[in-house]
Amino acid sequence: MPARIAHLSLLVPDYDAALDFFRRIGFECREDTELGDGKRWVRIAPPGGDAEILLARAVGDRQAASIGEQGGGRVWLFPETDDFARDYQRLEAAGVTFETLPRDEPYGRVVIWRDPWGNRWDLIENTRSDRG
């Protein structure tokens, strides 16, 4: 079995709008390759991040209905930061919807927010010394 997860697909309605949003919150585009028939292979990640998000333009009613609901209503994307204040301000400037105020938990500083399509994210600055 592979030793790591390389990509996670995120359904979006439009590649360019998604790229614009993710660039505004500090992600970088690692690849944007045309595949024909309007399909692209678009990989994004936070700078220095290992795992990547593959932006997938929804095709058909089933996929379109899943945009923003891939986590089934749960927080399911957990970017970890080394500078909570910087990234919180970046999210705020990008106009995300915050569901909570920033708070301290036993594992770190967190805030729950939604992207433009409704996906729930949890920005975390881990403060535990026993990460593993």
Language-model features, listed with the residues they occupy:
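Conserved beta-strand-loop-alpha-helix junction that forms the acyl-donor binding cleft
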Residues: 11-15, 37-38
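Amphipathic alpha-helical segments
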Residues: 14-29
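Vicinal oxygen chelate
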Residues: 1-7, 25-80, 86-116, 124-132
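Residues at or immediately preceding the N-termini of alpha-helices
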Residues: 15, 84-85
